[in-house]
């Protein structure tokens, strides 16, 4: 009886450790984690720490990040940014590290960072299997909403896409067999408004000179 109690406690502790095991990812200071599992990433470690840590649950995880190494040029400190990387991996109870290349200088980075040769390695230095892709957004890059972008990416089913439980799903809508009178009136009002808008277009078109009519036709043809 005295032996059973300690064994039971030890078993309970072991089971508890298994149930709450997680994945820790060490992140270098020049890597910015922009989203994790469809949400804004929460990293531990101080602002000036050489490495920070991202804690994730066991199983399939998705991390969105960018690598931006800094270089000294005279009195200036300049960075070169990689594209935004989407990485999906499946691990459990592991300590991982994002390994990124070290470039000799700014020119070396500018020539090679677009084809970023990075790895996710475990505690023994062995590379973990990763599905990866790039999260590309044309045009202005300032103020990007990465959580929204990765939501759209996952919905589109990209190479490193993940379906999260919190993702919004379309619910079926049952339409009434008989359209209520107020809906009929609203529809009639909308049709009337469309008709009025069309009449006004005709009116102003007839009033316009030849040059304005030509510009209007060109605009319509482009739509």
From Swiss-Prot:
Signal peptide extent: 1-21
Q: Does the keyword Signal apply?
A: yes
Q: Is Signal among this UniProt entry's keywords?
A: yes
Can you tell which superkingdom this protein's organism belongs to? Bacteria
What keywords are annotated for this sequence in UniProt? Signal
Pfam families associated with the record: DUF2057
HAMAP family assigned to the protein according to its UniProt record, in alphabetical order: UPF0319
* NCBIfam families referenced in this protein's UniProt entry, alphabetically: PRK04517.1 (NF003383)
Q: What family name appears in the similarity comment?
A: Belongs to the UPF0319 family.
Q: What is this protein called?
A: UPF0319 protein VPA1584
């Amino acid at each position: 009886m005295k032996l059973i109690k300690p064994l039971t406690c030890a078993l309970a502790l072991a089971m508890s450790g298994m149930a709450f095991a997680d994945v820790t990812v060490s992140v270098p200071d020049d890597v910015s984690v922009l989203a994790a599992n469809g949400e804004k990433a929460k990293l531990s470690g101080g602002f000036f720490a050489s490495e920070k840590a991202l804690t994730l649950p066991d199983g399939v995880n998705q991390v969105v990040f960018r690598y931006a190494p800094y270089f000294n040029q005279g009195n200036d400190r300049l960075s070169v940014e990689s594209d935004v990387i989407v990485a999906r991996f499946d691990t459990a109870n592991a300590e991982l590290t994002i390994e990124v290349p070290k470039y000799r200088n700014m020119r070396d980075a500018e020539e090679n960072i677009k084809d970023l040769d990075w790895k996710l390695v475990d505690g023994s230095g062995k590379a973990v299997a990763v599905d990866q892709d790039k999260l590309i957004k044309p045009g202005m890059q300032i103020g990007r909403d990465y959580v929204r972008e990765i939501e759209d990416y996952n919905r589109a089913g990209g190479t490193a896409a993940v379906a999260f439980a919190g993702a919004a799903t379309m619910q079926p809508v049952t339409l009434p067999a008989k359209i209520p009178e107020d809906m009929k009136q609203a529809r009639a009002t909308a049709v009337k408004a469309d008709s009025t808008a069309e009449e006004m277009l005709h009116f102003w078109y007839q009033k316009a000179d030849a040059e304005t009519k030509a510009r209007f036709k060109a605009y319509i043809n482009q739509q």
